[in-house]
Curated annotation (Swiss-Prot):
Functional description taken from the UniProt entry: Probable S-adenosyl-L-methionine-dependent methyltransferase that acts as a component of the wybutosine biosynthesis pathway. Wybutosine is a hyper modified guanosine with a tricyclic base found at the 3'-position adjacent to the anticodon of eukaryotic phenylalanine tRNA. May methylate the carboxyl group of leucine residues to form alpha-leucine ester residues.
Pfam families cross-referenced by the UniProt entry: Kelch_4 (PF13418), LCM (PF04072)
Biological-process GO terms, alphabetical: tRNA methylation; wybutosine biosynthetic process
Molecular function in Gene Ontology: tRNA methyltransferase activity
Gene behind this protein: PPM2
EC number: 2.1.1.290, 2.3.1.231
Family matches, as InterPro entries: Gal_Oxase/kelch_b-propeller, Kelch-typ_b-propeller, Ppm1/Ppm2/Tcmp, SAM-dependent_MTases_sf
Protein name listed in UniProt: tRNA wybutosine-synthesizing protein 4
């Protein structure tokens, strides 16, 4: 009996269209991989900038050299660049985040050996730093560490080419120890380089099986902004595979969206990576610290210590922080806070007996107080003519007659030396030609009466503060600049309010001068009022004054130690005795703001807008608040959903004015969002009456 013929079904051949689609998909995947690899170039250049400027506070020093710094990034960056002070401080903190987590592990695991696996290592020279016996930084780890660098095959090959052509690095690693095999393409006694695409979970699983750690060896995985570019399920698979290895730790540093994807910094950050064809894919699934903690516990790491980068900054030794602050002039605190709140440093382990020491454990983040707040104040984005003219930050403004606003000086890419006139519908406002104040930012511009405006202080750079003062005076239908008596000490990021009878009260700021000063326009002199000498001189506080009640209010601002204050102080000014009396001081988490603005909106109600906080990123319910001054009750003004999603304002370096009809305008300002680009504001209106488009022109 003959057997039945066996039918073998062959796979259908691809059509020409399917082949083209497949080839296109492969090309797209390769291009995406190259774009992700390209992020290494920018990152390593920024770290080289830090290495050159911050060498004395990096902790890498040649042994016995009396403090001579040891450099490693220089081998991987052919043309060094100098980044901005904010980017430098941010990358210094990133380097410190990884080093601090490794130090925590070393201190908490006795004398056990530690295998460090750097996932998506790029050109990171961490192994060379901590294997270099001529570097003081190595000594604290007592020769306990060995390293595995893991990255795309092309990137690992380029890194190894640099290593093999650099005698100093070869000397640190020592000679080859055994043949390389499988994904491991280079091996010495304390170092391995492995070529692996982390998107290939099977390949990564095979790689981890090749480590063969001893039962008493600690395995540490580092992912510094590497899993962030992967789809969340693939990144989770990596973390879960690492969690199956006994005695393992995972150090994660990547982006957060603490106020959601629509907040201005987050929106700018996401757009930057998307436009560079390296979109952040995991952050939308794990946008907050608490969600990252849940993630790690679900994937096998039950013991988690996580915080944002500002929590890390606050945990550092105060002497070290002081040294960092002294490296280069720095006046970008708002941008630094914004950066810090958008990055997490998480240290997770499956060793339930491991304890995070007191100097490493992050305190639990307090719950946002916004849940107890509510308001239905209407808001809308106002149409403006030539909106690009609003691109200026840290200027100062006044309202003159007919609700025309003068927005003076400030900064775009450079300091501006002009005035933006807003709302002058008939074009009648003019300033005559003649001597005028030079360009500046962080100054004050205060209306003393209908014919006199007082400008004082500011800065050109953090090391070039200004002490000059000017009056803008109306004579014969035209406005004229007149120089008046200068300050004894320069001052910027200060406050100035009109207290009546041609007098201006100047408070705080960066200065060696008095906490309070009075400028008397009639006599063209300054003098100190009588005030409690214990009252702090704060920088970038919010200050306003209400003539009807003869009450002034000072909120937030930075103290001498750069801690941001969380108090609202009520004071009275007595013009007869030229004295200031502190009437009341209250505290609230939402008062803790640096760079906020305030105005008394109506009897007994004060509006507080914007600024930044060390402990939270302000969102659609906390960016704008109103205080009932008789009860100190805080109400949060909810920014409408459509406005927040499409036009959320970055309330830094902005201006706030109240118009004759009670309408409040918030305008100008913005910030450079770390290395991701700038975000600029339009005009936001608070009030019940719709207003017409606002014309803008430059004087």
């Amino acid at each position: 009996m003959s057997s039945m013929p066996v039918h073998i079904e062959r796979p259908a051949e691809l059509t020409a269209k399917q082949r083209l689609q497949l080839e296109k998909k492969v090309r797209s995947m390769k291009y995406a991989d190259l774009a992700v690899q390209g992020t290494n170039t920018s990152s390593i250049a920024s770290k080289r900038s830090v290495e050159r400027l911050y060498a004395d506070v990096l902790g890498t020093k040649v042994q016995g050299s009396n403090g001579q710094p040891r450099e490693y990034f220089k081998y991987f960056v052919s043309k060094p660049l100098r980044r901005s002070p904010c980017i430098n401080r941010g990358y210094w903190l990133r380097l410190m985040a990884i080093r601090t987590s490794l130090r925590c592990i070393a201190e908490g695991t006795g004398q056990r050996d530690i295998l460090v696996v750097n996932l998506g290592c790029g050109y990171d020279p961490l192994p060379f730093q901590l294997l270099d016996h001529t570097d003081d930084a190595q000594s604290e780890f007592d020769d306990r560490m060995s390293f595995v660098d893991v990255d795309y095959p092309d990137l690992i090959a380029k890194k190894l080419e640099i290593v093999k052509n650099t005698p100093e690095l070869q000397h640190i690693l020592g000679g080859a120890a055994g043949d390389a095999a499988g994904p491991v393409v280079y091996r010495t006694a304390k170092y391995m380089a492995a070529a692996c695409d982390l998107n290939d979970s099977a390949a990564f699983g095979a790689l981890t099986e090749s480590f063969h750690p001893r039962s008493d060896e600690v395995v540490v995985f580092i992912a510094e902004v590497s899993l962030a570019y992967m789809r969340p399920e693939r990144a989770d698979a990596i973390i879960e595979a690492c969690g199956r290895i006994p005695n393992s730790h995972f150090i994660l540093l990547e982006q957060l969206l603490p106020a959601g994807e629509h907040s201005p910094f987050s929106r700018t950050m996401l757009s930057h990576f998307k436009s560079n064809d390296s979109p952040l894919q995991s952050v939308s699934s794990y946008p907050t610290i608490s969600e990252q903690e849940v993630r790690f516990k679900r994937l096998g790491f039950k013991n988690v210590n996580a915080g944002d980068m500002h929590q890390l900054w606050r945990s550092l030794d105060k002497e070290l922080v002081s040294k960092v602050q002294a490296v280069e002039p720095f006046d970008e605190l708002e941008e630094f806070y914004l950066f810090c709140h958008h990055y997490i440093i998480a240290h997770a382990t499956n060793d339930l007996s491991f304890r995070f020491g007191p100097k490493y454990a992050f305190p639990q983040v307090p719950q946002s107080p916004s849940k107890s707040c509510s308001s239905n104040s209407p808001m809308e984005l106002v149409t403006a003519v030539d909106t690009d003219l609003l691109q200026r930050k840290f200027g100062a403004s006044v309202v003159v007659d007919s609700d025309t606003i003068l927005f003076s000086f400030g900064c775009l890419h450079n300091k501006l030396e002009n005035i933006l006139v807003m709302g002058d519908h008939d074009g009648a406002f003019k300033i005559s030609k003649g001597p005028a104040p030079p360009a500046r930012m962080c100054h004050t511009f205060t209306k003393l009466d209908d014919r006199t405006i007082f400008l004082v202080g500011g800065r050109q750079s953090p090391t070039k503060p200004l002490g000059d003062a000017w009056l803008l005076k109306l004579r014969d239908g035209e406005w004229h600049w007149e120089m008046c008596a200068p300050l004894m000490y320069p001052r910027f990021r200060h406050n100035c309010v009109n207290v009546g009878k041609g007098k201006a009260l100047i408070y705080g700021g960066e200065t060696d001068g008095a906490t309070f000063l009075i400028y008397d326009c009639e006599s063209n002199t300054y003098y100190e009022p009588v005030y409690p000498r214990t009252f702090p001189r704060k920088v970038s506080a919010a200050m306003c004054y209400d003539f009807q009640s003869n009450r002034g209010y000072i909120l937030g601002g930075a103290l001498d130690n750069m801690e941001v204050d969380d108090t609202l102080c009520t004071f009275a000014f007595d013009a007869r005795t030229n004295s200031i009396e502190i009437l009341e001081t209250s505290s609230h988490p939402l008062y803790q703001r640096y760079g906020a603005k305030s105005v008394v909106r109506e009897a007994g109600h004060m509006l507080i807008v914007g600024g930044v906080s060390p402990h939270m990123l302000f969102n659609d319910t906390t960016s704008i608040i109103e205080v009932e001054l008789t009860t100190n009750k805080v109400n949060c003004l909810q920014i409408p959903s459509s406005l927040w999603k499409n036009h959320a304002q970055l309330l830094v370096g902005f201006e706030l004015q109240i118009m004759s009809d009670g309408t409040v305008l918030i305008f100008g300002g913005g910030a450079v969002c770390y290395g991701f680009g700038a975000a600029w504001n339009g005009i936001l209106r608070l009030g019940r009456e719709t207003i017409a488009a606002i014309p803008l022109r430059i004087l």
